[in-house]
Amino acid sequence: SHKDDPLAPGVAFPFIKRLLKLNELFGEAEPFRVVVLSRNSPETGERFFSSCRHYNLPVKAGAFTSGQSTFPYIKSFDVSLFLSANRENVMYAIQQGLPGGWVIPSGKKAEEDNGDDNELRIAFDFDGVIIDDEAEREYQEEGLAGFQHLEVTKANTPHTPGPLNRLFTKIAAFQKMDAQRGKNDPYYKPAIRVSIVTSRGAPSEQRLITTLKTLGMSAAELFLLDGLPKSN
């Protein structure tokens, strides 16, 4: 009876809205796709897609399983990032070797997102996220000196990919597409802004830069915290 009543925007709404807005820049290419995985019923799915149309949110794919687990379908949909407001679901996905991200409230209502600002801003942690945890293990086992020695020795060797590497490389590919659009426009503003945050400090940044170049990523911001808390 409520199928025509729009659902309220969730915690991931602003991110998803800006992500899908990027597709408008490239027509049929559609570099980004969003899939909804829900344990709700297909009837609820009907209301969900009606809500998407209400908010002009072009989500086209989904699975509604009436109480059954949706995890078996993550790989079926070839998902590069599984997002959920449920921390336990995210942790389970990660334990299954799937790329997961926990969406937490920002303290700002989704509808308050600036509709005139379409730039998508994403900050990535480096170690254990973009790359594997080799360097982190070295730090835990051999201390800072061992970690620095490893990174300096392998300064020209890219790191092994981490859990979000696939998503990261897709964003890098989008950056190249976006750069082509602004090639002849000196006032063109990139549609996506990527920041890298890491506990590293010099000289271990050299291998980080090598890895980013190998992945084709042009980060707008790089924060080398040298051990300072990332929460700052």
What do the PLM-derived regions correspond to, one by one?
Residues 65-71, 108, 226-232:
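Short acidic loop-to-helix transition motifs that present clustered carboxylates
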Residues 82, 122-124:
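Residue-level marker for buried hydrophobic side chains located in beta-strands
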Residues 72, 76-77, 217, 226-227:
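Short, solvent-exposed interaction modules
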Residues 1-68, 116-118, 125-224:
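Alpha-helical substrate-recognition element adjacent to the catalytic core
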Residues 51-55, 71-111, 117, 130, ...:
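Hydrophobic, ordered structural segments
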Residues 44-45, 70-71, 89-91, 204-205, ...:
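Short, well-ordered alpha-helical microsegments
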